Amino acid sequence: MPRVAITYCRQCNWLLRSAWMAQELLSTFSDDLSEVALIPSTGGAFRIDFDGEIIWDRKRDGGFPDVKALKQFVRDRIDPGRDLGHLDRTSGEPGTP
């Protein structure tokens, strides 16, 4: 099973942001991920790795990932045919604003 690691800057107080993203991933993919690890760091780091592949780096990608895009990326790696419900709908479809 895949592993996700979220490296965050503890000096920047990004623990809550990284814990929220971990919670979102675990809530959606509880049976599909072996773990979501939180790794404290320094120097403004905020990086998300999926099985050793860097999928988001704050400095490289500019800012923080949208949780919708993060979940869709993980879904596409784990189970591309899986419906994420409202996350897969675009504005104007039934059930969306």
Task: Locate the predicted segments by residue.
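Domain-level signature for proteins that mediate thiol-based redox and metal-cofactor handling
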Residues: 1-97
